[in-house]
Every structure is written in C-alpha cells, then in structure tokens.
Amino acid sequence: MAEESSCTRDCMSFSVLNWDQVSRLHEVLTEVVPIHGRGNFPTLEITLKDIVQTVRSRLEEAGIKVHDVRLNGSAAGHVLVKDNGLGCKDLDLIFHVALPTEAEFQLVRDVVLCSLLNFLPEGVNKLKISPVTLKEAYVQKLVKVCTDTDRWSLISLSNKNGKNVELKFVDSIRRQFEFSVDSFQIILDSLLFFYDCSNNPISEHFHPTVIGESMYGDFEEAFDHLQNRLIATKNPEEIRGGGLLKYSNLLVRDFRPTDQEEIKTLERYMCSRFFIDFPDILEQQRKLETYLQNHFAEEERSKYDYLMILRRVVNESTVCLMGHERRQTLNLISLLALRVLAEQNIIPSATNVTCYYQPAPYVSDGNFSNYYVAHPPVTYSQPYPTWLPCN
C-alpha cells in the first residue's frame, strides 16, 4: 500500500504537454538569443537547442553522463501557460549529472566555456582564446554549491536585456522551487532526440511526447495556480532569502495568496530568512539592485510599485529585527524607489534638489540659512548583522 501511495504521488507530479505547449517549447528552443560579450568581444547568436546539444555531447565525450536535460523557471511556465503574468525572463536549463568531486565541477565549467567557441563568428581566431578569456567575456555569473544536501553549479551567460541563458548542473539539490507557479520543469530529452533523428519538421500530427513535472508535487494544482495567478507553497521554512523578493514580484503582477491567513506566516518566514541570508545593509542593497536589473530590465514602470510592495511586506511582517535596523532597511528601499522615479523623470534627481522651506518664527539668528541643499545618499560602509534569532 505504501508503494502504491508513493507511486500515486509521483504520477500526480507529471503531465503530458499538449500540442500548443509543445509548439511553444519548440519556439523557445529554436529562438535565437544573443549572448553579449564584454569589451570588443562579439555577440554570440545561439539557440537553446544548439547550446544544449553541444554541451551535452561534449560532457559525454568527457565521461560525464547527462541523465536528462530540463527547461526550468519562467520559461517553463511560459510554455505551459502563455499569458501567465510572469513573462519569460531567464532561460534556465538543468542538466542532471553526477558531481562527486571537485574534478567534475571543474570539467563541467571547462566544457561549457569551450562550447562557446562553436558560436563565435567566422573569422575569429579561436586558437588564441582560452577558457578564462571566454569566462571574462561572456559569463554573467558563476556559482558552485557543495553542502551535505546540495551539489550543483550554475553558469549564467550574459544578455543585456536581462534574458540570460542559465546552465545549471545538478547532482543534488534540497529545494528546487519557491512557489507552486515556479515549480515546473519540462523534460527535453524526447524533443532533443526528435531534432537529432527526424528529417521531418515538427507539427501537430508529428511530434514527440513531452513530459512536464511540478516539483511542488501536484501538477494539476500548480497548473491551476499558474492559470489563475495564485500564490501557494509548501514547507515555507525552507525558502531562502530571495523568496521575499520573488513573493513581492508575484504581488506586483497581480498574483494573490490562496490563503490569506497562512500568507502572514509565510511573510514572516520570508522576511526572517532574507535578513539571515543578507545580514548587512550593503548586501541588501546589492541584492535588491541586482534583482531589479535582472527581473525588471524591460519593465521600468513596474519597479516603483514593486519596491513599494516590498517595503510594505518588510514593514508589516519583520519580527526578528531590531528597530533601528528595520528602519534602515525600509529607508534603503525608499531611496531605491526615489531613484527609480528620478530615472523615469517623474521627479527630479534627489541628489541635485534644492529644498526650500519657511523657518519657524523663533529663528531670528541672522546667520541662519533658510534653505537646504540635499546631498547624495549616505553610503553604508560599516556592515554588521541586522537580525536577531527568533525565539
């Protein structure tokens, strides 16, 4: 009975994609995506299909078996529900591989970097370009995680419009989603095999069976949440600090909680985790600025609303922070919001504003200055912990 119950739960997490979804997946995999080089390095024109096939074949040539390849994140959500409110930001690809030692991590990195040589324009002398040079030119972010529960690496390829191509190589990972609507993964192997073996173009009457999985556990429930813009999760205590930023992003896109009572507990968890993972004001500033750059690159008008929602959540749900440190974080969010308005020319830049005011009657000193010239915001240079343990 236990085995049957486990099988039922596993089956609930999978679903077969219909033709409309397979067609959108094909478009995502074959769309040309520019990878912008720094300095004088040329832009690479790639498709996800080509980069996956190149990296996979080179990994297997190097002795690293790829168990499967999946499309993850907002791109997977876009394939399943076209107008879901999340858009299609980073193009996340997951390669399931074994990473038992440091040598495999290094080999994966070198394989990906050398694979980029295939996409350099004709006429470029590839013999003089090293993996280190390619990393400096095209890699936006390089991450390696090795803990008791997580063994994975991430290589993010730069795109100036915020549509980075992210290649994630996973041996094990404790949690692969934050909310039900971002829990989807689409297994690409059958479609990649079709590209390799079929001489006929893909069509409604001639296409492979493609399987999707929800790491949330119930595919149909998560799919309903995505269609109806609902916010739900499981085991919120496991969500990392970035979950607060993702939650505020969902709210600004008109997603709403499935349970108004539970969401207050969730907000407190996320605020506490944010301040644990980003304990000083400089880290918080860097995280917020990077998040805005990566997730609102083409949505300037939404930045201010997003920051105001984030400020409200932090103000109402922070319970593990000392008063002055909470105010410091709220002030940081307000300053970022002010900067956003200034960049949009909705108000003048606060660094160049002259603020006039009428002095109080008791100000009779002839040397009293009746105006104040605003100075640039203070740069926080003394990082220190801004959270207290929850009892």
UniProtKB/Swiss-Prot annotation:
GO molecular function terms attached to this record: poly(A) RNA polymerase activity; RNA binding
Domain of life: Eukaryota
GO CC terms, sorted: centrosome; cytoplasm; nucleoplasm; nucleus
Catalytic activity as recorded in UniProt: RNA(n) + ATP = RNA(n)-3'-adenine ribonucleotide + diphosphate
The protein's enzyme class: transferase
Cross-referenced Pfam families: NTP_transf_7 (PF07984)
Subcellular location, principal: nucleus
Effect of C146P: Decreases substantially the interaction with PLK4. Weakens binding to PLK4
Induction annotation: By type I interferons.
Keywords of this entry: Cytoplasm, Cytoskeleton, Host-virus interaction, Nucleotidyltransferase, Nucleus, RNA-binding, Transferase
EC number: 2.7.7.19
Task performed by this protein: Catalyzes the transfer of one adenosine molecule from an ATP to an mRNA poly(A) tail bearing a 3'-OH terminal group and enhances mRNA stability and gene expression. Can also elongate RNA oligos ending with uridine molecule, provided that the sequence is adenosine-rich. Mainly targets mRNAs encoding endoplasmic reticulum-targeted protein. (Microbial infection) Seems to enhance replication of some viruses, including yellow fever virus, in response to type I interferon.
Subunit structure: Interacts with BCCIP and PABPC1; the interaction has no effect on TENT5C poly(A) polymerase function. Interacts with PLK4; this interaction leads to the TENT5C recruitment into the centrosome.
Protein name: Terminal nucleotidyltransferase 5C
